[in-house]
Curated annotation (Swiss-Prot):
Primary location: plastid
Listed InterPro entries: PSII_PsbJ, PSII_PsbJ_sf
Subunit-structure text: PSII is composed of 1 copy each of membrane proteins PsbA, PsbB, PsbC, PsbD, PsbE, PsbF, PsbH, PsbI, PsbJ, PsbK, PsbL, PsbM, PsbT, PsbX, PsbY, PsbZ, Psb30/Ycf12, at least 3 peripheral proteins of the oxygen-evolving complex and a large number of cofactors. It forms dimeric complexes.
Keyword Transmembrane: yes
Keywords of this entry: Chloroplast, Membrane, Photosynthesis, Photosystem II, Plastid, Reaction center, Thylakoid, Transmembrane, Transmembrane helix
Protein function: One of the components of the core complex of photosystem II (PSII). PSII is a light-driven water:plastoquinone oxidoreductase that uses light energy to abstract electrons from H(2)O, generating O(2) and a proton gradient subsequently used for ATP formation. It consists of a core antenna complex that captures photons, and an electron transfer chain that converts photonic excitation into a charge separation.
Mode of membrane association: Single-pass membrane protein
Similarity comment text for this entry: Belongs to the PsbJ family.
Protein name in the entry: Photosystem II reaction center protein J
Transmembrane segments: 9-29
Biological process according to GO: photosynthesis
Length: 39
């Protein structure tokens, strides 16, 4: 954890957060639409 990585921590957190929100949104939308079982 020297902080000399090529990828900034904020960038990892941003991409990870967006991916998590996207997956969660798709899961909720699929369950709400009734097509969650097809996933």
């Amino acid at each position: 954890m020297a902080g000399t990585g090529r990828i900034p921590l904020w960038l990892v957190a941003t991409v990870g957060g967006m991916a998590a929100i996207t997956v969660l949104g798709i899961f909720i939308y699929g369950s709400y639409s009734g097509v969650g079982s097809s996933l």
